[in-house]
C-alpha cells in the first residue's frame, strides 16, 4: 500500500514496500536498543567492562539511526565534531568530501557527553567510538540476530529517511539530513517519480 507524502501543493507517493531500499523501521530500531539493555542487564563478566560495551553499542545504534549517516562517516566522528553549544554534529562525509551539519536532540547530546565523561579518549583526535567498520557490522548484526531482524548498517540510513517521509518532513530537510547534493537523489530512492513530480521539481516547487 502506498502512503501519501504531502509537501507544498503536491502529494508525493512513497514507493511500494518491495521497491524501497532494504530498511528498518523505528520499531525495529527501538527493538535493537531494548536488546542492548537486555544483553547487559546481568553481566557475567566484569561489570565495568560490560557497562562500556552497553554504552558503546547503544551510542553506535543511536548515531546510526538519528543522524542517518553512513557507517564509515559515523565511525570517523571525533569528539570535537560534536558542537554542544549549537547542538549539532559536523559530520565529515567521505563520499562527498564535505561536512554535513546535522542537528541533534538534547537527549542524544547528553548521551554523547556522558560517554566522553565516563570514557575519556586518550587522544581527542581519535574517533569517538574508535572501532573498525567490521566491528560495527558485527555489533549491528548481533542485535539483528537477537531481535530476529536481518539488518546491515545502511538499513538505518534508509529507515530514517522513510520514517521522516512518513512523518511528513519536507523533502529538502530529509535531503539535507542525508547529505544528498541534490533532492532528486532523495526522490529517486524513495518516491514514485511521476511526470507531475518532475514538472514540480523543474519548477522549483519541491
Language-model features and meaning:
Residues 1-206:
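Conserved catalytic core of the tyrosine transesterase superfamily
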